[in-house]
Design a protein with these regions (language model features):
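Activation segment
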Residues: 18-22
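Short proline-rich PxxP-based motifs
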Residues: 58-71
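Terminal C-lobe "cap" of eukaryotic-type protein kinase domains
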Residues: 88-92, 97-112
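Conserved catalytic-loop aspartate of Hanks-type protein kinases
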Residues: 26
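Conserved C-terminal C-lobe helix
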Residues: 73-85
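Structural helix C-cap motif within protein kinase domains
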Residues: 39-42
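Conserved activation segment of eukaryotic-like protein kinases, specifically the C-terminal portion
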Residues: 1-11
Length: 126
């Protein structure tokens, strides 16, 4: 794929560099969205488009020694999930199916109890 569309804050580096890309650009965007949902900010925030591009290509994502105290309450599994999604190398960035095997997802899924829903009777329509 080579067509580039989207919001700059969520674009993977390969899109910005106008390189061929795969569905892993969506994994990158998922990482940005997850970061934003957990912190209230995007990881590459700026009011300047060139600075956004620079941040996406080069800014190191860190959760330690920051003024953002909200990361203190976020699990290491969640942080690892974000870092894997935001791998700048699309060849080593995980696929969606690989993400489903990560501890942040599997630990959550294992803790969930499924509800025993009653079977619904099907009414005949006249």
């Amino acid at each position: 794929m080579t067509l580039v569309l989207g919001s700059p804050l969520y674009m993977a580096p390969e899109l910005i560099n106008r390189e061929p890309y795969t569905e892993k650009v969506d994994v990158w965007s998922l990482g940005v969205i997850t970061y934003q949902l957990l912190s209230g900010k995007t990881p590459f925030e700026s009011r300047n488009l060139k600075k956004i591009d620079y941040n996406i290509k080069r800014k190191k994502i860190t959760f330690e020694n920051t003024e953002q105290e909200y990361w203190n309450d976020i699990s290491q599994d969640a942080k690892d999930f974000i870092l894997k999604c935001l791998d700048r190398n699309q060849n080593t960035r995980p696929s969606i199916s690989e993400l489903f095997k990560m501890p942040w997802i599997t630990n959550y899924m294992n803790k969930q109890n499924t509800l025993a829903l009653p079977k619904l009777e099907r009414e005949e329509m006249n």
